[in-house]
Regions:
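Glycine-centered loop/turn motif at secondary-structure junctions
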Residues: 58, 123-125, 244, 283, ...
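Active-site neighborhood of glycoside hydrolase catalytic domains
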Residues: 141-151, 156-265, 270-283
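Flexible, acidic glycine-rich loops studded with aromatic residues
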Residues: 247-255, 259-265, 269-404
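Flexible loop/turn segments at secondary-structure boundaries
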Residues: 41-43, 69-75, 135-141, 196, ...
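Generic recognition of stable, solvent-exposed alpha-helical segments in well-folded globular domains
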Residues: 46-49, 109-116, 174-182, 227-235, ...
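Feature activates predominantly on carbohydrate-active enzymes
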Residues: 1-176, 184-194, 235, 239, ...
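Acidic, contiguous N-terminal accessory segments
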Residues: 1-31, 241, 246-254, 261, ...
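Hydrophobic alpha-helix position signal
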Residues: 54, 121, 217, 240, ...
Length: 404
């Protein structure tokens, strides 16, 4: 980090640096960038370049999202059908392309790939956080491994993305036969000692038509779908905890009877900061990643020529610093805020360069929120700072957004 500071000073001041003493320390211990490699397959070279970019901005956590409805891309030994059947999408594949795309595309990550990413990250003082997605966002998993749903379930609950079969059933034995060995194997590949379980966006009314879940509810005293998900996550967290692995999850994991997944879990607050504040007050450590400020799949502006989504608004550069990870009035939970994260989701990505321009220069704003004291850099100052970093992006060959 000291070397990066000197590097950026050289960009600002040239080869002659002013004399002085630098006293600098990060505000938060967790400063992350997430990458969705399930919807769009990013090759290892891209990931290594992203790690280089993160290091230039003193980010220290890479959140690797390689499993979702569309694919499971990690080459695991416990259940090889997961990646063998879903790593590629398109005509003739088990999982078709989105929006009618028929051209075969995709890929998977070998254990050698994982080791390469972990080693490169370690050299840059970055840890890699892996994520599997359960119980929802599991369409690919369900397609690849039969038996993860109750055959007597007559429900057709749909996910936000339109899938009617994307949630595994915690009341059937096959689910546990798959999940516990899978989770332990994945966690064992990454030195961080934490496994992100997903747990977001369970379809409304999930498992409502499942006789097996009805019996589970009666046996365990559960009432709602949130109760069932929470029970499932707590059970999986217990199995991982016994193996020395801490769990993380999206904010929804704390819903349900007895607090869902349990207070030891690290939660990621993505729909806004409110759920994160509530979770922190219940005893969770929280990473703030509100979509309105930190989701880089959202367009930079309303300009119709700007690529990106708009479901949570638009995120111009200035908006990435127009918030505080510890909201005003919630200073009591400051010790529970572990840090911040920017997220890039790949539903609409067709080529890597799109992601580059969505991530940079906005990644600088989230890095700033994670490092600096509250309120130091506003939008105007950030835009000025971004111009300093431009040549550094160019030097590592990272394309950046050049619009307004």
């Amino acid at each position: 980090h000291a070397g990066v500071t000197l590097l950026t000073l050289r960009e600002t001041c040239g080869d002659r640096l002013p004399c002085g003493t630098i006293i600098d320390t990060p505000r938060f211990g967790y400063r992350g960038q997430h990458l969705d490699c399930a919807r769009h397959f990013f090759g290892i070279d891209f990931i290594l370049r992203l790690l280089d970019l993160m290091a230039l901005l003193k980010l220290n956590r890479f959140h690797w999202h390689f499993a979702d409805d569309e694919a499971f891309r990690l080459e695991v030994d416990t259940h090889p059908l997961l990646w063998q059947r879903t790593a590629f999408r398109g005509e003739g594949e088990l999982v078709p392309g989105v929006f009618g795309g028929g051209i075969r595309a995709g890929g998977s990550y070998s254990k050698a790939d994982v080791a390469r990413v972990v080693a490169h990250a370690k050299a840059l003082q970055i840890e890699v956080l892996p994520e599997i997605e359960v119980p929802a966002h599991s369409h690919a998993m369900i397609k690849a491994v039969p038996g993860l749903r109750d055959p007597g379930d007559n429900g057709e609950e749909a996910s936000v993305q339109g899938y009617i079969d994307n949630i595994v059933n915690p009341a059937v034995p096959a689910t546990w036969d798959l999940l516990v060995p899978l989770a332990k194997e994945v966690a064992g590949l990454f030195p961080i000692g934490i496994l992100h379980l997903g747990a977001d966006e369970a379809p409304h009314g999930a498992w409502g038509g499942s006789p097996a879940v009805a019996a589970l509810k009666a046996r365990e005293g559960l009432q709602t779908s949130d109760d069932v998900q929470g029970w499932m996550l707590a059970k999986l967290a217990g199995a991982l905890g016994a193996a020395g692995v801490r769990v993380a999850a999206w904010e929804e994991a704390s819903k349900g009877v007895q607090g869902g997944i349990g207070n030891a879990a690290l939660l990621f607050s993505w729909t806004g900061q409110g759920p994160g504040v509530e979770a922190a007050r219940r005893g969770h450590d929280v990473v703030m990643c509100p979509a309105q400020n930190a989701y880089f799949d959202l367009a930079h502006s309303p300009d119709p020529d700007d690529w990106g989504a708009a479901w949570a608004g638009f995120v111009p550069l200035e908006k990435t610093v127009a918030w505080d990870p510890v909201p005003q009035g919630a200073e009591d939970i400051a010790p529970r805020i572990s840090g911040v994260e920017a997220c890039f989701w790949g539903e609409f990505t067709t080529e890597d360069g799109q992601a580059e321009g969505m991530i940079a220069p906005r990644i600088l704003g989230i890095a700033t929120k994670g490092w600096e004291p509250a309120g130091r850099t506003d939008g105007a100052a950030l835009r000025s700072l971004a111009s300093v970093y431009g040549p550094l992006y160019d030097r590592i060959g990272w394309r950046r957004y050049r619009g307004a």
